[in-house]
Amino acid sequence: NEWAAVAAARAAVVGGFKGTANLLAAQMYGLNAIGTAAHCFTLVHDDERSAFESQIAALGKNTTLLVDTYNIEEAVKTAVEVAGPELGGVRIDSGDLASLAQRVRNQLDALGATNTKITVTNDLDEYALASLQTAPVDSYGVGTMLVTGSGAPTCAMVYKLTERENSAG
């Protein structure tokens, strides 16, 4: 049913979630719209730096930048260069989340962004959340497994097809 995600978003907030990344549910039910940019947002820019600059120009330095589209270490460096040490947060959406969160935390601290938050996403279920308890993670983006339920089949993949004309025409 095409309305299942909207209903699930409302139910999650009723159940204690801070908000939803489902913009239709947020609009329909007056919920707090939260979330970060998608990989396609980064891909439609000439490079990661210009994507980060665009997001910060629109949402301010307190936004959360997605840092795993290309190279996480380079993205974190670029994010702090663009936003400064007051960058609100970074999001990791793939790979070994616990290990990457630790590496990113160390890098952020070394760059002076000691208050920058780390959010992890990627088909998180109760087992993944339990495995992340000792990782330096500030928040979790839970969606797929919340809506479908643990044990139900899902398609854990991202297809990043993007076409655009570059700035040179």
Write out the residue ranges for each language-model feature.
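Buried, small/hydrophobic-residue-enriched core segments of structured protein domains
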Residues: 1-114, 124-131, 135-136, 148, ...
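Generic secondary-structure boundary/loop-capping signal
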Residues: 38, 94, 143, 158-159
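Short hydrophobic alpha-helical runs that function as membrane-insertion/retention elements
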Residues: 35, 119, 139-142
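Active-site lining segments that contact anionic ligands and/or coordinate catalytic metals
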Residues: 115, 137, 156-158
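C-terminal structural cap/anchor segments
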Residues: 150-169
